[in-house]
Amino acid sequence: MDTRLIAIATFVVTFGILIVLKRLNYIESWDTFSILSILAAVLTIAAYFFTLVLFPQDYDQLKKEILDEINESLKNYEIYFKCKDFKKPIVKDGAVRIDKCVVMATKLNLTDHGYIVDLKFRSNWMDSKGTHAILFIDGDDAQINLFEREGEIFYIIKSKNKISGVYIQLKSVKWFDEAFSDNWNNIKIMWDTSKDEIWLEINGIRVSKKLNFDFNLNDSVIYLGSNPLEDTYAEGYFDRIMVYKSADTADFGTPTVRRFE
């Protein structure tokens, strides 16, 4: 139990006992009652700080518990997301909130099927210090805010029930293909929800024409990739986008593939 709650409960019980003793005339004067009440408050505060020194809270353990809870809750979400509805927020437990529907590719995996990008979702949100958010996850009991500052990657974990503001510096981001290392913060998938159009931008320049889909992109999983059978594969270019339409992340279903033009 929280030490502060114990201290408050102790004072309330002590004060209640003093009131009972006064009503039973064991404490005759109000002056004596006032002095004893003040003494009880002082002793309670002293005991509270003594307890903090004698039994310090294990913040590392609490931090680990939060991380474990978050990792467990995120196992089933992979790169699943829902776009934010502007009439009301639509945020599934552990899912990613994308402000203005802008996401960022930050990690490249080289597979037998070509380059597959695990999307690290990005919003346009800037905090008071001007750092740019990379990932924001909002769950029932905790929030994760991953962001970049001066080339280093950090994340803050906030929990409603435990620690608020655990601030952790991550190891530097490693790219699987160094050819893409200069594109950090510069590759964006742009999505116009009103028209269900999606396109790719690098360094703010639109490098592909709009791609029209015959279904709503909500509840979709998006991959960027390249074809290992084409020359562009060796040069590390993205040449296609894959959209998995499924409401359940455990079953991605059949991908819809569109090439960049």
Curated annotation (Swiss-Prot):
Membrane topology designation: Multi-pass membrane protein
CC terms in the record's Gene Ontology section: plasma membrane
Disulfide linkage: none
Residue spans crossing the bilayer: 4-21, 33-55
Assigned keywords, A-Z: Cell membrane, Membrane, Transmembrane, Transmembrane helix
Record has Nucleotide-binding as a keyword: no
Entry-linked InterPro entries: ConA-like_dom_sf
Major localization class: membrane
Protein name: Uncharacterized protein AF_2291
Top-level taxon in the UniProt lineage: Archaea
Annotated compartments: Cell membrane
Keyword presence, Transmembrane helix: yes
